[in-house]
Structure formats: C-alpha cells, structure tokens
C-alpha cells in the first residue's frame, strides 16, 4: 500500500474533499494541511516517505481549493468549519486523534486545532507560520499598522477585487506567487516595511512582481506547475481569499481557549529565506516561552516559503525525525 499515491473524494462536514492518500489505512494517521495558494499537490514529496515510515497519510485539497467543494459564503471558511473538515476526515478514516502537519494557512489551522481541540491532536508540525497569540483582532492590528499603504492581507478583505485579479490569468498568478516567495527570488514587495510599501489605492496583489524565469525551476517542473494551474482553474480564488476574511472571526473563536492546554508535542520548520519569518526573527524564543509542548524548530538552509517543496529531503528528515521521537 505504501508504494502508490491514491486519489479519491470523500464527504465530510457537508463538503466534498478531494484527497491524496498513501500508506496502510490501518496505520497511525497523519493529515497534511496545505496553505495559500496551494493544494494537496504541495505535499507530493512527503506522501511516500511518510507511508514508507509506517504512516497512513492523507493530503486533502482543503475547502475552496482544487477539486474540493467551494462554498460561496465567506463565513464557510472560518476556523470552526475548517477544523471540522480535518477532524471529520480523521473520524471518517477511523481515528479520533491524529498527527497534523500544516504549511502556511495549514499551519494557522494546525495551531487552532491544537488550541480548540487539544484532545484530538496527537502531535503537530507547523511549517512557515509560527504560533501567535494575538492581543487584539488581527485585521484591526494590520489595518492600523499599514494604514493607507498596501498590505496583501488588508487587500484581500476587499470583496470581489482580490479574487478577480488572481483569477484573471491563473498561470501568471501562480508563477509570480510561487516564484516570488521562493528562495530563488529577490525579496517580495508584499513583505517590505511599511514605508517601502506602495499606496493601497491602485495596487494589486500582483503589482510590481518580477516576471519569473522560465520553468523548470530547481524545485518545480512544468508538469508540477500545470497541476496547480489546472486545480486553481477549477476552484478559482474566492475560497482561498475567504480564509483571510475570517481572521477576526477566528480570533473571537479562539481567544478564550487557554494556550496552556496546548500540551501536545509540536515542532516548527521554516526555510532560512522564508520572507514570513525574515520579518519574525523571534519566532523560536516566542514559541519556546508560550507553548507547553514546544519541541524546537528546524531552519532549512536555502529554502524559501515553500519549504516542503523547495527542500523536500531536508524537510522530510526534520518531519520524520520528529515523528520518530513521539
């Protein structure tokens, strides 16, 4: 069973989730949760190594992405529904508890799972986005911080505008976003300091992004890229940007849940050149002081934001090393 990746669609929590699956269905379960803008395809380098190590591994296209259901209500993308999707998937596969691995938005969802449902998470690995216990609604903080300057999360709050821009030319969008946050690119404009950012008015998510080099890249070939384009051509971008539109609602759902209950073992992995953590250099010390079950971090040299794709061997070594310690 460990030698192939299987694909199927399951009905969970009122939505259809398309998933990739490998390993023995009777083995311990690990659920891989992708981020923005990705799908279960982003875990292609992890599926078989995890299965070979004795895990039953599933990587769903999360709601709004790829070939999974994409509800048209913004509220359908709150962390309560997203968490119920993953917990329901585990239950469907016969598991009350599972190991969860999340990248980018998948990492944010992992942190919420650990905080809201600590009894359902055996252990967790977060990639690229560290745990943060926001002191106030995060969208309010970002609105004050950036004011009239462009910041992509604030831009994503604008109804219709962001998803229309991103969906206009899916291949161009995916190429610029995937290249722009990788180690091979120069610093992406959306991560500059406030004074260096352009004005919000008249600026889009793709404005000013460099034209990527022709494929293949060291970590992504033409066929792998085309899979992303095909999947986002199906789903569009309303669902993906709607995850961002729930950030304040997610804060309200989680803020009274004690961080002290997050006692499950957790590990953090990031790329040395990930622009998210270049702006958050204290991520390790902050989590070490905050999370009871924190087991340290792995910083992977030469990797950008797409760490599990850019440096799969190094990422897998960190992931499997952590799992073997459980």
Task: Describe each model-derived feature in a short phrase.
Residues 3-5, 16-17, 65-97, 101, ...:
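Flexible "cap/lid" subdomain of the alpha/beta-hydrolase fold that forms the substrate-access gate
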Residues 6-12:
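Short acidic-hydrophobic surface loop/beta-edge motif
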Residues 15-69:
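Conserved HGGG/HGGXW glycine-rich cap/lid loop of the alpha/beta-hydrolase fold
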Residues 24-25, 93-96, 326:
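Glycine-rich phosphate-binding loop signature in dinucleotide/nucleotide-binding domains
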Residues 36, 40-43, 55, 105, ...:
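Signature tryptophan residues that serve as conserved aromatic anchors
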Residues 294-326:
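Catalytic active-site module of serine/aspartate enzymes centered on a nucleophile-bearing elbow/loop
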């Amino acid at each position: 069973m460990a030698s192939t990746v299987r694909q199927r669609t399951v009905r969970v929590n009122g939505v259809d989730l398309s998933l990739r699956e490998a390993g023995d269905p009777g083995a311990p379960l690990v659920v891989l949760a992708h981020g923005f803008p990705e799908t279960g395809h982003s875990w292609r380098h992890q599926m078989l190594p995890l299965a070979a190590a004795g895990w039953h591994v599933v990587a769903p296209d999360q709601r709004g992405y790829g070939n999974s259901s994409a509800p048209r209500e913004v509220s359908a993308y709150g962390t309560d529904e997203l968490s119920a999707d993953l917990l329901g998937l585990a239950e469907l596969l016969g598991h009350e508890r599972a190991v969860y691995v999340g990248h980018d938005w998948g990492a944010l969802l992992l942190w919420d799972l650990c905080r809201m449902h600590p009894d359902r998470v055996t252990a967790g690995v977060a990639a690229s986005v560290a745990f943060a216990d926001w002191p106030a609604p995060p969208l309010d903080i970002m609105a004050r911080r950036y004011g009239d300057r462009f910041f992509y999360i604030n831009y994503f709050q604008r109804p219709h505008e962001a998803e229309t821009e991103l969906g206009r030319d899916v291949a161009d969008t995916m190429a610029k976003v995937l290249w722009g946050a990788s180690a091979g690119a120069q610093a992406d404009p959306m991560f500059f300091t406030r004074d260096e950012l352009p004005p919000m008015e008249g600026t889009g998510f793709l404005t000013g992004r460099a034209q990527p080099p022709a494929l293949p890249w060291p970590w992504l070939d033409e066929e792998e890229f085309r899979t992303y384009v095909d999947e986002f051509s199906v789903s569009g971008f309303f669902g993906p940007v709607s995850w961002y539109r729930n950030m304040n609602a997610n804060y309200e759902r989680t803020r009274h849940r004690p961080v002290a209950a997050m006692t499950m073992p957790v590990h953090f992995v990031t790329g040395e050149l990930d622009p998210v953590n270049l702006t958050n250099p204290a991520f390790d010390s902050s989590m070490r002081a905050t999370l009871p079950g924190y087991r340290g971090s792995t910083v992977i040299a030469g990797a950008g934001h797409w760490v599990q794709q850019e440096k799969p061997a190094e990422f897998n070594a960190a992931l499997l090393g952590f799992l073997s310690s459980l």
